């Protein structure tokens, strides 16, 4: 893998990672070093197929964007991969470990964490308390250990120190004593991202991190997402903001109607006809009458002949009207 320059974010010039795939950017292409591998994952709701992913690999150490129109199955796939939902069939592996049937909290402890489009901060806890909840394997969570302060006091202090360091990194340190309910939408997004790092993950999955964010905080969120990669983490995020995707993503996966229809570097994917079809429809430049079957599909020559016939008839009608 190699890196190419990408436009600067803030005051820091970032590098885009290239050479992630073993072949051309087609759906299901093998990656040089995948951290997440999906095989034959399907999710049905009655007669509706929400997800049908034959094969997908997420490259390690890169930022991958998962895009597609509303209802494409992106969040459903996220829920399946994180253990929040169960697939109808298929398997997937994180870092070589099969995750099928493993509950969400165990998936997170293994190093694969996620955030949500609608933030899950506990409103009646302070920002610092929310952060401390993100730390796994706390001695004080075990009943007998919680009765002996000598067991949990030192780990508790270490957890609090780590939480404060992350809050400072995300510029939320001045809010540590505030209730989470008092934060703005963008600040809650930052809190969720910071809390996810309390478990020292290898793969961070962000579900629409820019949704509902004040424009003033957009740049800060972009910087922090790029910062995850700088810290050696892999990022997989769902997003509708194509400018953001083009700006920070190393690799893009496009879903439509539950399937992966395209993948590759952002500059290539944005020009893929399958992507245009997914967002605008496969018949965006075809007469609606032809699409619905109200009129037949005609050749260009036939179309010209019909147009000339109509024009001739119109001219004849005008001449007839002009006669005294």
Residue positions per predicted region:
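N-terminal acidic, proline/glycine-rich, low-complexity intrinsically disordered segments
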Residues: 1-12
């Amino acid at each position: 893998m190699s890196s190419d320059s990408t436009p600067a974010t803030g005051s820091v010039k970032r590098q885009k990672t290239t050479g992630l795939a073993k072949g051309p950017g087609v759906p299901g292409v093998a990656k040089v070093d995948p951290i997440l591998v999906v095989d034959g994952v399907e999710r049905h709701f009655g007669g509706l197929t929400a997800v049908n992913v034959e094969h997908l690999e997420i490259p390690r150490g890169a930022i991958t964007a998962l895009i597609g129109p509303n209802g494409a199955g992106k969040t459903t796939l996220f829920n399946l991969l994180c253990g929040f939902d169960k697939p109808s069939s298929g398997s997937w592996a994180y870092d070589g470990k099969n995750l099928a049937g493993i509950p969400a909290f165990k998936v997170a402890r293994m190093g694969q964490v996620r955030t949500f489009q609608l933030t899950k901060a506990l409103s009646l806890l302070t920002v610092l308390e929310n952060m401390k909840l993100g730390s796994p394997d706390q001695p004080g969570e075990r009943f007998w250990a919680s009765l002996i302060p000598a067991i949990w006091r030192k780990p508790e202090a270490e957890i609090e120190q780590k939480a404060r360091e992350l809050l400072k990194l995300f510029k939320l340190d001045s809010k540590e004593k505030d209730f989470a309910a008092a934060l703005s939408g963008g600040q809650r997004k930052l809190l969720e991202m910071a809390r996810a790092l309390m478990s020292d993950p290898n793969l961070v999955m962000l579900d629409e991190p820019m949704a509902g964010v004040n424009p003033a905080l957009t740049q800060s969120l972009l910087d922090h997402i790029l910062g995850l990669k700088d810290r050696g983490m892999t990022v997989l995020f769902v997003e509708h903001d194509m400018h953001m995707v083009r700006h920070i993503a190393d690799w893009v996966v496009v879903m439509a109607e539950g399937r992966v229809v395209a993948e590759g570097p952002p500059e290539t994917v944005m020009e893929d006809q399958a992507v245009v079809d997914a967002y605008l429809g496969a018949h965006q430049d075809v007469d609606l009458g032809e699409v619905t079957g109200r009129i037949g599909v005609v050749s260009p020559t036939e179309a010209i002949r019909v147009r000339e016939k109509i024009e001739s008839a119109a001219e004849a009608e005008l001449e007839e009207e002009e006669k005294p």
